[in-house]
Amino acid sequence: MKKYYAVTGIALAVGMLCTTQLAGATQAADPSVGSLDSSNVVTEFSAQGNVEQITFKSAIKSAPMSSARSAQTSAIIPGLKNLFVSAPGSDFSLNDSSNNYIKRFTQNIAGIPVLGSSITEVLDGQGAVTSAIGAVTSATKGAFPADLAAGQAAALASATKIASAGKDASAISLVDQKAIWFDAVLIGKGATGSVAVPAYQFSFTTGFAESRVLTVAANDGAILNDRTDRKDINRVVCDANSKVIDLEASNADALLKCGKTQANKPTRIEGQAASSVADVNSVYNFLNDTASFYGANTKANDLTALIGNDEGDGLGKAMRAVVRICVTDSQNGEQCPFANAFWYNGQMTYGQGVTTDDITGHELTHGVTEKTNGLVYANESGAINESMSDVFGEFIDLSNGSSDDTAANRWAIGEGSSLGVIRSMKDPGKYGEPAIYKGSNWKPTATNPNDNNDQGGVHSNSGVGNKLAFLITDGQTFNGQTVTGIGIAKAAQLYWAAQRQLTANATYSSLGKALNSACSANVSNNVAGTTAANCTQVANAIKAVGIK
């Protein structure tokens, strides 16, 4: 079955305190701080004993920062990789500096990236580093074959055979392949003490709105990870007019696409007058509301450039959407109207009547998350992924002046849609979701996340993150903590800065630390008028939901 990341329904930096030594593994040397003064360093650990955050008592202004570090500074500060106990031979490349006070680096070993790795530096207003959050591998085992290309070709043949099993060969298309170092901990699937092994990662399109990502060990061809993705949610809007798509047909993916040369032709494109189809106009307007909110309240800048798609039809890279789609498959039969919406491969797809502002913002934020930190869609990182989509979806809903923004609907997800209200961020328990970490309604971590356990409770456990966002924004006395809200403008910038810091395998503990760090950075950089008093309220909210 295909996976819907629909509107319905992580340990960081491995190895600092690890005592497990795998045979043949190359371990990191004793973590000298290099050019950093160890007396200036405060190290925080996760519950599993891994390095989670480095804070400097005095901001680091030493070389190579003779002057304030600019957005173009591409080198990690000397000694920081040792503090995170990076594997020998590691170097770090800058992969994001779109936010002037947050810099995100990827770990590489011998020039090959480590999947899921990152070290994020947080800078003050003068460009000095105040803290860092990281997820790195501390050791490697094995080596890539001397003939890298030949090894990759052999692994591709194996991966293609697996991806093609039970599928029409015409539906399988390779979209990306690369050599990587694979450490299961960094994608939330391994135990403390694991090491990085040489591997190849292959991404295939395997059917309707579906992709499959296979990671193959370079040394023995073992399958290290097998993931099927479908992200449930530019301005090019196409109308399917209740056309039924067989999800199991070999050409279903092509039948979904929106563009002049695609199966679904544009009904309304940028600058055109309103359509006679209400859902087309709703989506056209809400795509704009989402892009405008991100542009005004985050450093994401151009949302079209970040998550848009170019179908080669002369309309360029655009935020594309198909409305009024119907679907059928062998398990659920025909669904018309299709009571859902989803994001996949730069395009939004909606069933009739689910074209609301919060659902649009929710699903497009899955695209933003995919392009920023790539939160793994399982267990706690998956719950944070879902919560981030609810948070920004509701921020957009509460800020665009829509007629249904009543007091009763504030913090409700799905109001005005054919689904009705499906979640309450203010009161998650009303819909069977937890408001406190590992409290009532919490779904346990799954050792084998799959559709039967909601990938480890990604929709249910998002309630903790949703309650947290409500508390930070509006405030409330809850679970022994009194929180004064800081408002949407400050909260949106706070969550955006935290989004930039989170690693792919983030836990709720990681989210709490990232929010505290982001708040301090926003004060130092005078973002949205954030104050130290606001940060006290953020800390109180984090305590209230039990994630610190």
UniProtKB/Swiss-Prot annotation:
Binds 4 Ca(2+) ions per subunit. Binds 1 zinc ion per subunit. Hemolytic activity is observed from 6 to 37 degrees Celsius for mammalian erythrocytes. Residues 1-28 form the signal peptide. Zn(2+) binds at H362, H366, E386. PANTHER family: BACILLOLYSIN (PTHR33794:SF1). One of its GO terms (molecular function) is metalloendopeptidase activity. Residues 442-459 have a biased composition (Polar residues). Induction: Expression of the hemolysin is modulated by the availability of iron. Belongs to the peptidase M4 family. One of its GO terms (biological process) is proteolysis. Coiled coil: none annotated. Its cofactor is Ca(2+); Zn(2+). It is an enzyme of class 3 (hydrolase). It comes from the Bacteria. It is found in: Secreted, Cell wall. The active site is at E363, H459. Keywords: Calcium, Cell wall, Hydrolase, Metal-binding, Metalloprotease, Protease, Secreted, Signal, Zinc, Zymogen. This is Zinc metalloproteinase. GO terms for cellular component: extracellular region. It comes from Renibacterium salmoninarum.
